[in-house]
């Protein structure tokens, strides 16, 4: 008997494992909400042909500016600090679900890094190496260049869409 937050975290784990990872010719950044139903504002996970959750969150403005300045590792450290101090069950469950969402984002990032490494083995274009080097630390650490900032913002935005949160960029 899982809570809705636990079900969502499990769904997000499934999404990041099942979604196709695309590295398209000519593109200079990566990240795509590529799981078929992610084009709709729904959590793209079905059970016996039906959506598990229905509609996702829409028309939200996320704190991309702060995520860019601090990097997502800083958020995780804050969550850990709250978890070690908080004794409220509801807040603890929310924060654990936040950590699970970050873990899913890390796995999705890892899949992109692996795909880039594989593609570079057969097609060692400088463009692909630059994308790989650019993606290596973002969105977890603050970007050091404008190019990293673009990649960090886009990757975070695409992950939000993939997880059924349709944000505006600003």
Model-predicted regions and their roles:
Residues 1-170:
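Catalytic cofactor-binding cores of redox enzymes
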């Amino acid at each position: 008997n899982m809570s809705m937050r636990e079900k969502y975290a499990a769904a997000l784990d499934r999404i990041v494992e099942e979604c196709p990872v695309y590295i398209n010719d000519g593109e200079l950044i990566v990240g795509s909400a590529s799981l078929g139903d992610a084009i709709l504002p729904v959590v793209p996970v079905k059970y016996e042909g039906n959506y598990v959750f229905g509609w996702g969150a829409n028309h939200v403005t996320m704190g991309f500016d702060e995520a860019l300045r601090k990097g997502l590792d800083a958020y995780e450290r804050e969550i850990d600090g709250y978890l070690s101090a908080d004794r409220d069950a509801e807040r603890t469950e929310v924060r654990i679900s936040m950590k699970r969402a970050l873990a899913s984002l890390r796995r999705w990032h890892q899949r992109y890094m692996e795909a880039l490494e594989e593609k570079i083995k057969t097609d060692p274009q400088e463009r692909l190496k630059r994308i790989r080097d650019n993606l290596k630390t973002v969105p977890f650490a603050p970007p050091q260049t404008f190019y990293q900032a673009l990649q960090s913002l886009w990757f975070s935005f695409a992950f939000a869409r993939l997880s059924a949160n349709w944000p505006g960029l600003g």
